């Protein structure tokens, strides 16, 4: 807290008055890092989530999720070791992190509800299982494993995640069309040129 106050040019008490605990500072840092300039702190209120919710097909909806959520993970990923270390010694940090994770899952649940309501999930796939699949695969820890530990580019990682989730969530013919060369579902997205590796 002393270092934050010093860097901000304010009194330590000002930092404590604003954030109260180190856990609150850490979570605020994650939310700030995850956002874009002038974007709302709450992910579900960001413009790209509106595009996800309004997408006309399940393939496009999934492609937008992969494109934008992983951009967030690229920004917050470097903070995860600090979260892990702080959680092991400060229960407040652990609780705050779990709260953030729970909000992420709830937001993903709202998106899965849209897939289900529009009949975009493959036959027999229960929405709760679909949520587990997205929540398990689309996360910062997996992003770090592939991009840092395996050395993949962001585009390759996004293409893999899209192909993996499309195969698990979408009806086979929808997934096949979304993964096809020249697919309009991904034509304007960063990972389009890497899809051939996983289709």
Regions found by a protein language model. Give the residues of each.
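Short, hydrophobic secondary-structure boundary micro-motifs
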Residues: 81-83, 95-96, 123-124, 145, ...
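Amphipathic alpha-helical packing segments from all-alpha helical-bundle domains
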Residues: 64-84, 91-118, 128-132, 164-167
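C-terminal peripheral helix-coil segments that are non-catalytic and often amphipathic
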Residues: 71, 106-121, 131-199
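Helix-turn-helix
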Residues: 1-28
């Amino acid at each position: 807290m002393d270092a934050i106050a010093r860097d901000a040019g304010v009194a330590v008490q000002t930092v404590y008055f604003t954030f109260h605990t180190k856990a609150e500072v850490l979570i605020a840092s994650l939310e700030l890092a995850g956002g874009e300039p002038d974007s709302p702190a709450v992910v579900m209120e960001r413009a790209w989530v509106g595009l996800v919710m309004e997408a006309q097909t399940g393939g496009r909806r999934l492609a937008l999720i992969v494109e934008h959520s992983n951009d967030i993970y690229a920004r917050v990923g470097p903070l995860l070791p600090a979260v892990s270390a702080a959680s092991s010694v400060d229960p407040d940090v652990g609780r705050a992190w779990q709260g953030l994770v729970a909000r992420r899952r709830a937001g993903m649940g709202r998106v899965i509800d849209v897939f289900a309501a529009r009949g975009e999930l493959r036959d027999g796939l229960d929405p709760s299982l679909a949520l587990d699949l997205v929540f398990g695969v689309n996360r910062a820890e997996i992003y770090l494993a592939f991009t840092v530990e395996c050395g993949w580019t962001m585009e390759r990682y996004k293409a893999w995640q899209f192909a993996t989730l499309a195969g698990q969530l979408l009806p086979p013919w929808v997934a096949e069309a979304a993964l096809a060369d020249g697919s309009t579902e991904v034509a304007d997205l960063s990972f389009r040129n890497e899809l051939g590796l996983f289709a």
